[in-house]
Curated annotation (Swiss-Prot):
It catalyses: uridine + ATP = UMP + ADP + H(+); cytidine + ATP = CMP + ADP + H(+). This is Uridine-cytidine kinase A. The lineage of its organism: Eukaryota, Amoebozoa, Evosea, Eumycetozoa, Dictyostelia. Belongs to the uridine kinase family. The gene is udkA. Pathway: Pyrimidine metabolism; CTP biosynthesis via salvage pathway; CTP from cytidine: step 1/3; Pyrimidine metabolism; UMP biosynthesis via salvage pathway; UMP from uridine: step 1/1.
Length: 499
């Protein structure tokens, strides 16, 4: 598409979806700020149909060879209360992409000093935002790095102590009133969208939002709108239309335009080799087990313990006993893949013994909740080992979310990752990604599990070829619901006696 050209797509029941491109530069600014990812939303797809959309705590996207691919970055601009967030939610729901990060520009405000009256402060001026922080945040997310996102409170007009942690994504969406203002920020965007909504509609929405959600009075909202919001919209926001690739009239009410926009984003993703409809699929036919996947020798003793663990009638006490026994053997096997050096010692008889000693610091990462089942066997083998924990749980769509992480000092350490089952591999991938983001090289990670699905463990191997995997059994089947077959059921529930 040539510079400053415009293309319109019209439908019978909706205003046009306008596509434009331009190479004009924007004015530059400097400021300071904060940021927050949008949290989980219940998004209405159709009347009576609600889909929960998760937009935080996701690891970055890798191709089938384990290489990090740049995510698709989308900038959504528009006036205050134009429906930007609603449009983003509908796009996310329609895309059905596995991992999305949705960032709001509202979080990138400066702290307001006590001397400033919020009702007299222009929150719609470019100088109210920290574009340097926005550029840094988007750049690091594009590189697959972990970023800490501060939160901004509109009641106190300051940053909160708590920060959210974000781990990259397939798609990164930044929405706000002035997302297209900074040229440096625009250069990081693959798609630039402008939401064009009638002034009266935006004012009505702003009144409702600021009074109900931000503790403002009617008079203060109207004063701020007439004094700052409307003039800033005319002076700074409307001119940004010329930078947009796509203009969506009527905002979130324009369903046809949103559907066309979604299809356009799908095409952009497919151009990068990513098909949302074929996420994480592997061709397992003819594949040999890679050298980094180790299955402990299947002796009669191992088969007997696995039979007890797989048996649905096994009592809790027996399950715990044989789980601890089997995990001890698996962990012992995993320790053999650590680096050792020769050591000569003198025995009580005065003779010399040529032995080995561990040549590395080791620690462990317990993937809660099920990984806690392996912690006691680990401590019985590795005296005084330092352990960290991550809590990763899947939603009803079997997508993992990181809720908690606490790691010891992993510098120059080999790390044992403990999780008794590997099903789809999604939660395990996130656990490994946490370690990589803390500077642990792939070749210093050993993933220890009891039972893995063939698809799940191969999925992980292709993404992290230098990670070692040690298991006692690999089951070839995985149900449509993501359960290992034959498997052993919910491992943590059976170990802890919960339902």
């Amino acid at each position: 598409m040539s510079d400053n050209s415009t293309t319109k797509v019209t439908t019978n029941d909706s205003p046009s979806l306008t596509t434009t491109t331009s190479t004009t530069t924007a004015p530059t600014t400097t400021t300071t700020t904060t940021t927050t990812p949008t949290h989980n939303h219940d998004t209405t797809i159709a009347p009576g149909v609600v889909k929960k959309v998760y937009t935080s705590g996701r690891p970055p996207w890798y191709d089938s060879k384990g290489n990090l691919k740049n995510p698709l970055v989308i900038g959504v601009c528009g006036g205050s209360a134009s429906g930007k967030t609603t449009v983003c939610d509908k796009i996310i729901a329609n895309l059905n992409v596995r991992w999305v990060v949705l960032l709001s520009m509202d979080s990138f405000y400066k702290n307001l000093s006590k001397d400033n009256d919020p009702s007299k402060y222009n929150f719609d001026h470019p100088n109210a935002f920290d574009y340097d922080l926005m550029v840094k945040t988007i750049s690091e997310l594009r590189a697959g790095k972990k970023v800490n996102i501060p939160k901004y409170c509109f009641k106190t007009h300051s940053r909160l102590v708590h920060q959210d942690t974000v781990y990259g994504a397939d798609v990164i969406i930044l929405e706000g009133i002035l997302t297209l203002y900074s040229k440096e920020l625009r250069d990081l965007m693959d798609i630039k969208i402008f939401i064009d909504t009638d002034d009266d509609v935006r004012l009505a929405r702003r009144l409702k939002r600021d009074i109900a959600e931000r503790g403002r009075t009617l008079e203060s909202v109207l004063h701020q709108y007439n004094t700052f919001v409307k003039p800033s919209f005319d002076d700074y926001i409307i001119p940004l239309k010329k930078y947009a690739d796509i203009i969506v009239p009527r905002g979130s009410d324009n369903i046809v335009a949103i559907n066309l926009l979604t299809n356009h984003i799908r095409l952009k993703l497919k151009e990068r080799g990513f098909d949302p409809e074929k996420t994480a699929q592997l061709d397992l036919e003819g594949l040999e087990l890679p050298s980094s996947i180790h299955v402990i020798k299947e002796t009669n003793q191992i088969k007997a313990m696995l039979s007890i663990l797989r048996n649905k009638d096994t009592k809790v006490g027996d399950f715990v006993f044989y789980s601890d026994r089997l995990c001890s053997l698996i962990i012992e096997e995993a320790l053999t893949y650590l680096p050792f050096t020769e050591k000569i010692v003198t025995t009580p008889t005065g003779s010399l013994y040529h032995g080995e000693e561990l040549n590395s610091r080791i620690c462990a990462l317990v993937v809660l909740r099920a990984g806690g089942c392996m912690e006691q066997p680990l401590r019985s083998i590795c005296k005084g080992i330092r352990t960290g924990k991550v809590l990763i749980q899947s939603d009803e769509m079997k997508k993992p979310h990181l809720f908690y992480e606490k790691l010891p000092n992993v510098t120059d350490s080999h790390v044992l990752v403990l999780d008794p089952t590997i099903a789809t591999g999604a939660s395990s991938e996130m656990a490994i990604r946490v370690l990589l983001d803390h500077g642990v090289p792939e070749n210093k990670i050993i993933f220890v599990s009891v039972i893995a699905s063939l698809k799940g463990i191969l999925y992980l191997n292709y993404r992290f070829p230098d990670v070692q995997f040690v298991v006692s059994a690999i089951d070839k089947e995985l149900s449509d619901e993501g359960f290992i077959l034959p498997g052993c059921g919910f491992y943590s529930n059976r170990y802890f006696g919960t339902h």
